[in-house]
């Protein structure tokens, strides 16, 4: 294996602590790997909301915060404002490479800054923004979103995508230089041995029911309402883990379900392992780490035949994929098939066997090799200056106007 020299890595994250989600979790694992292997890092991320505690360092790495705004419909996810100072911070830190975690607003500004400063950049595709636009009845923004995503990612030397479907979708929309980079899972933390008889008894004192669960943000794009088809049954107990804007609506829809709120650490690991079946209906998941964590816990999974779950679920072996259009209607029969005693234990074993070697150590080692490859390539082929006008002209007018002002300011910063 090639020995990688110590690097200075600037990570610009569209989301970060105290917000906990897929983007944040993957950035944390990358930072931990960088620290353990002698590299230096800086994080630029949105600030916390007024009622949340904001941390300024993680593992000794500085976190530079930018102001945030909240967008209607998804106001639980603060959006970082791409100030001109982003360019100044990157210039002063002078990284070997810039890692853009799910770039869109803040990451888009950083992509422009990287070209201006002639610093190589890698974009990590993690969020289906166009899909979210459609789910929130903002379909006209979907096309504009793809134009912007294409611009941002094609300014980077490499795009890393987590699944075969996301790679195909990116290529279909004109994104170049795409490589596959999945996600690791902590198979020591998420493990079948964490199963708790006591926890299961607290959910179902009779001990007669099968426990079916969901873990994730309680928001429209996750499709949690599809689980309502399993509600009110005498043989199934639903357990919904997470919080979000649709929590109250879902509680009213499924009054007999147990809603735990957001969980983390060992409490979350024990919850996963204590399920009999995990269901995630979200059709806009570029990867779906929750499915992988459930599998590491020895739990069969049901997901949509869309996005990341297609790569994670081996139908009939560790779970089932259901068509998006009739997911809710077909879920009860699919759940009954998996929970049947004649096949359930075999599928539990297959779930764990399929992911036990997909460690974050292995995945982050791959990532660092991508860093090294891009740095080496940029040294052989110097980056050209990329002024704002060439790309701004290709954008939707509303984006071009805003970006034109910000880009010109950032050049002077």
From Swiss-Prot:
It is an enzyme of class 2 (transferase). InterPro entries: Glyco_trans_1, Glyco_trans_4-like_N, Glycosyltransferase_grp1. Coiled coil: none annotated. Keywords: Glycosyltransferase, Lipid biosynthesis, Lipid metabolism, Phospholipid biosynthesis, Phospholipid metabolism, Transferase. GO terms for molecular function: mannosyltransferase activity. One of its GO terms (biological process) is phospholipid biosynthetic process. It comes from the Bacteria. Transmembrane segments: none annotated. Pathway: Phospholipid metabolism; phosphatidylinositol metabolism. Its EC number is 2.4.1.-. GO terms for cellular component: membrane. The keyword Lipid biosynthesis applies. The keyword Lipid biosynthesis applies. Belongs to the glycosyltransferase group 1 family. Catalyzes the addition of a mannose residue from GDP-D-mannose to GlcAGroAc2 to generate 1,2-di-O-C16/C18:1-(alpha-D-mannopyranosyl)-(1-4)-(alpha-D-glucopyranosyluronic acid)-(1-3)-glycerol(ManGlcAGroAc2). This is GDP-mannose-dependent alpha-mannosyltransferase. It comes from Corynebacterium glutamicum (strain ATCC 13032 / DSM 20300 / JCM 1318 / BCRC 11384 / CCUG 27702 / LMG 3730 / NBRC 12168 / NCIMB 10025 / NRRL B-2784 / 534). The lineage of its organism: Bacteria, Bacillati, Actinomycetota, Actinomycetes, Mycobacteriales.
